[in-house]
């Protein structure tokens, strides 16, 4: 079996209940999410802008092709997971990008997740109505 000469950088991103496996390959700036264009995958442009933030910030949007496999969660969670995955893959390409990405707050994983429902309550915190008599 031959070993390929293609250089690829991988990053894993998580947000809420979404998990994104990102692969950066030197190329012309194409982006594929689950084998689809971002415009066909996400419902609006704001989510796509949020996802592409690390590439725009480091001016590498036209340098790498981005291939993403993402599962779980909704559109915002998936975009956040992809953003973190792209950030981690970019740090593998050049370590000096980490300071700029950290200043923009892109390196840290957003650990906020939905709070679980407790028994005796209607939701995580919503209690039944109190009756005095």
UniProtKB/Swiss-Prot annotation:
GO terms for biological process: translation. PROSITE patterns: RIBOSOMAL_S9. The gene is rpsI. It comes from Ureaplasma urealyticum serovar 10 (strain ATCC 33699 / Western). It comes from the Bacteria. GO terms for cellular component: cytosolic small ribosomal subunit. Belongs to the universal ribosomal protein uS9 family. InterPro entries: Ribosomal_Su5_D2-typ_SF, Ribosomal_uS9, Ribosomal_uS9_bac/plastid, Ribosomal_uS9_CS, Ribsml_uS5_D2-typ_fold_subgr. The keyword Hydrolase does not apply. This is Small ribosomal subunit protein uS9. The keyword Electron transport does not apply. Keywords: Ribonucleoprotein, Ribosomal protein. One of its GO terms (molecular function) is structural constituent of ribosome.
